[in-house]
């Protein structure tokens, strides 16, 4: 299955972010201003 690219929406599938040996992207959620529901995007994991 295709993975979700960095900065793309992963709200509906939070374990879909792309990863490789060099990096691991994680789905990070936030509430945009004025939004009633959260928005999640794949971001680079800061731990590596």
Curated annotation (Swiss-Prot):
Compartment(s) where it occurs, according to its Swiss-Prot or TrEMBL record: Secreted
Disulfide bonding pattern of the chain: 3-18, 10-27, 17-42, 29-40
Tissues with expression: Expressed by the venom gland.
GO molecular function: toxin activity
Keyword DNA-binding included in the entry's annotation: no
Superkingdom in the source lineage: Eukaryota
Keyword terms: Disulfide bond, Knottin, Secreted, Toxin
GO cellular component assignments: extracellular region
Coiled-coil zones: none
Main localization of the protein described in the UniProt heading: secreted
Entry comment on modification after translation: Contains 4 disulfide bonds.
Assembly: Heterodimer of A and B chains; disulfide-linked.
Family per record: Belongs to the neurotoxin 19 (CSTX) family. 12 subfamily.
Domain notes for this protein: The presence of a 'disulfide through disulfide knot' structurally defines this protein as a knottin.
Name of the molecule in the record: Toxin CSTX-14
Lineage: Eukaryota, Metazoa, Ecdysozoa, Arthropoda, Chelicerata
């Amino acid at each position: 299955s295709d993975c979700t690219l960095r900065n793309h929406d992963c709200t509906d599938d939070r374990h879909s972010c792309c990863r490789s040996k060099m990096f691991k992207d994680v789905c990070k959620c936030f509430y945009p201003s004025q939004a009633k529901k959260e928005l999640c995007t794949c971001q680079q994991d800061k731990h590596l």
